[in-house]
């Protein structure tokens, strides 16, 4: 059994986290981390509310790990420098994470894979951000769909319990690295960003009633009918599988919204 890092990115939660589940199940010790990536942050305006949103949820995630007797190490800088140095200094054997499909992320992860491989450190990715990756729902001729309706039909036909599996981590939490280590958690101001919240962020909870009546309420501005969960799905504070399980039984319109995102 090895000593591993779990690198949180677009998955700011512990519950139903595929990559974290994989790391905990296959490692004797797992240290969760988050990196505020300067290659991304340096391109953003200083009052970008997405950064504040992420910062707040990283704080919540850190507190959640501390309640479990562990901690989330939070870094600020270039992942290409931080991860090789961290694995060497702390003698980690592998790094686990959930796959990110943005062009920058794909290039970054390929470089990190090569850097870690040169140091005999394994780099593992898991599917967590989507139900189906782009090569999993294709036309009969093997080509990708360009029209939503036939794509959604194929998507629904393929959906089963395997793709909606809940990655419960509770039985493996004993493998989290224990103790709180002093890794300096910089303030937003130290990173050059404003901590002034310009508007209330959507809540990271939904209800069966909201999903069930989503298509009836969403077009009425005076009614709180939209789920407002897109930002939470984007940064993984809630599980796409959990929402799909609810929508599958309660509201096809809401499920179609998730398919459109996929």
What does each model-found stretch correspond to?
Residues 1-159, 250:
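Trp/Phe/Arg-rich N-terminal binding region typifying the photolyase-homology
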Residues 121, 147-262:
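Glycine/tryptophan-enriched, flexible segments
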